Design a protein with these regions (language model features):
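Amphipathic alpha-helical dimerization/coiled-coil segments
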Residues: 2-29, 97-123
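Solvent-exposed, charged/polar functional surfaces in cytosolic regulatory/catalytic domains
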Residues: 40, 77, 111, 115
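Residues within the DNA-recognition helix of helix-turn-helix
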Residues: 73
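N-terminal helix-turn-helix DNA-binding core of bacterial DNA-binding proteins
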Residues: 24-66, 92-101
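Beta-hairpin "wing" of winged helix-turn-helix
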Residues: 78-88, 95
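A generic structural-conservation signal
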Residues: 58, 86-87, 121
């Protein structure tokens, strides 16, 4: 029994919570994603990519940043699994990954800054 191994007995049972607690690796994955979103420009780029698929050049103009800076943010977001890319000839297009994780982060960003998605206001 886990309770018998705790330093203090406060009359509560935590066996259930400990049994279903995510692994240390899962918490580290979440921490790594939060690190990726610790930059305001990166959050803005991710938010835009949740609403459109764009190339580096166009997105650079949209956020008024250099192409190398946007490419750096793309690399970080891609390594976190939040965006994906596809090649069409010489052009590479980026968009938010179609994953529960990316959708949840998108909604979290919107909730935290209290803005409405263009697609949600049209419905």
């Amino acid at each position: 029994m886990i309770q018998n191994h705790l330093p203090h007995d406060h009359g509560q049972t935590i066996e259930h919570e400990l049994e279903y607690m995510p692994s240390v690796e899962n918490f580290q994955t979440v921490a790594d994603i939060f690190k990726q979103l610790g930059d305001g420009s990166r959050i803005r780029i991710f938010w835009l990519l949740c609403h459109c698929e764009e190339c580096v050049i166009n997105l650079s103009a949209m956020v008024d940043m250099s192409s190398p800076a946007v490419s750096h943010h793309f690399k970080q977001l891609k390594s976190a699994g939040l965006i994906v890319s596809r090649r069409d000839g010489k052009e590479v297009y980026y968009k938010a990954a179609d994953t529960e994780q990316a959708r949840n982060f998108h909604h979290m960003i919107e909730w935290l800054v209290k803005i409405a998605c263009p697609s949600q206001t049209e419905e």
